[in-house]
From Swiss-Prot:
NAD(+) binds at D38, E39, K40, Y41, D42, S87, L88, E119, R142, E181, K298, K322. PROSITE patterns: DNA_LIGASE_N1 (PS01055), DNA_LIGASE_N2 (PS01056). The active site is at K121 (n6-amp-lysine intermediate). Keywords: DNA damage, DNA repair, DNA replication, Ligase, Magnesium, Manganese, Metal-binding, NAD, Zinc. The lineage of its organism: Bacteria, Pseudomonadati, Pseudomonadota, Gammaproteobacteria, Enterobacterales. InterPro entries: DisA/LigA_HHH, DNA_ligase, DNA_ligase_AS, DNA_ligase_CS, DNAligase_adenylation, DNAligase_N, NA-bd_OB-fold, NAD_DNA_ligase_OB. HAMAP family: DNA_ligase_A. DNA ligase that catalyzes the formation of phosphodiester linkages between 5'-phosphoryl and 3'-hydroxyl groups in double-stranded DNA using NAD as a coenzyme and as the energy source for the reaction. It is essential for DNA replication and repair of damaged DNA. This is DNA ligase. Its EC number is 6.5.1.2.
Amino acid sequence: MFKKNINIKIKTKILNLRKKIEMWNNNYYVKNLSLVSDEKYDSTLFELNELEKKYSMFLNTSYSNKIVAKNICNKFKKIKHLSNMLSLESIFNYKNLLNFHEKVKKNLFYNEKRYYCCELKIDGLAINLIYKNGILDSASTRGDGLQGEDVTKNALEIKSIPHILKKNNLSFPKKIEIRGEVFIKLSTFNKINKMLKSKRKKLFSNARNMASGSLRQINPKITKNRSLSFYGYGIGYVNEKKYYYDQHDALKLINSWGIPIEKNTELCKSLNEVKNFYEKSIKIRDYLDFNIDGIVVKVNSMKLQKKLGCSSKYPRWAIAYKFSSEEKCTKILGVNFNVGRTGVITPVAKLKPVYFMGTIIKYSSLHNKDIIDKLGIMINDTVCLKKSGDVIPKISRVIFEKRKNVKEIIFPKTCIFCKSKIEFCLRKKNLYCTGGFLCYAQRKQLLNHFVSREALNIKGMGNKIISQLIEKKIIKYPSDIFKLNTDKIIFLKGMGLKSSENLIKEIIKSKTTELYRVIYGIGIPNVGIYTSMNLANYYKNISNFINTSYEDLRSIKGIGSFTSNCIKKFLKDKRNISIISDLLNVNLKIK
């Protein structure tokens, strides 16, 4: 009886999961609506797959949770694929990758090498191109894997899809399927959304939805105006065996025919190299002009691919290794502006508190105006927070469907702490307060930096002591530190006679120091400890340094034009020269 009840619960769970997947698929692929995050979809699909494996008695052979939608959108005629166009099974951790690797290993021929072709998994829409004698004959979406929607007219409007293949030393096959991904560059996505916003039209929620909706238009002119992009990622059917290339070589072949391919692809000769490629992909994803949600790991050998074959849902020779991340949605209540040590003004979103991965998140950095414009963030927007690994959660996207009563984020024209002039750094895309030590927000951080271990190394003078001294208006500039005595610090919270005497000893000790420590300690923007050492080795004394020229700085190995400009700008400011002079006037001895 107990076992029967358990089975009923399991069956109900499986049926409910199937209904969810079907509903999400239908909305996404037919109506162009994304109801859930990628992570939620993937985790639900993974849960269903695991339950079906474990409880095979409930596996319905007429149901495939990977069929895109029961009804492919009927506004396009259908094209049957020459070879099945299956989706990839998704994995989310190294253990899953190891399991995939072990399954591949079991099917190896004697002494056969286990090479993997690793590619970035572009978050777009799969497309199947059929070329006959080098001329584009048709283009179709993945559809249900057996047949897809005819989008040939629209594909002809995508500049990166060649209408005629380029000739090389190898003649074209009579018939070949070239498969790839249609996507929209993030720069284009933001440009189009900005234009839609100006016309008070509905915005696209993400780049993939825009790409999908743009490819599946009745009017090809709309597709043309959306400036879609395409990368090829492999060959499906080909009518001649001489074109049976291993995956990595197949990419080179189609590229030689004029098919664009993603340039970060690597041939990995070990599982460790695959792991390294995955980790590298995480690091570069924020610098790409298109979205990726993982990597694709393919067995490189065509012979081994054929031996491994496919299940009813997936090829057994490839896997999608997704980036592990979690997502939570919340609301932006307002934006504060923080000023850093070097004057960088950072917008910080004040969020409706949300419990996320063990902590309550109330704030999230927006970094700079470029990021705000790129994501289209406004006050009162509902946004998604994403966290990968141990990285601090960041805002990954805006849910435009929930947008109402929003306000534009207005950047200050003068510093909110000291009213100093604000300047824009084109290279770093940041706004800067020019106040320096005059700015209360910068002063505390600059003085903390000045006494730090790499700079003057004044032991015992931490953040709490400096904060109290600033609040009581005892110190304002670095030279004021060397005017302190026990009478001025003994009454500070946490200080007594002994600790005050010890601190004064450390201050006196630090008055004899090295040139690189002073250069580093005065806090020149974009001048770190190693650059400071480089400068000290070259100039030998403080006088030579403060009287340097731009040309002189550029002649120093390792110091580029940007850093040289930062140094010259700092030394041109009379306030900064005054700070250095004041240090010399309190008998700072620089070796």
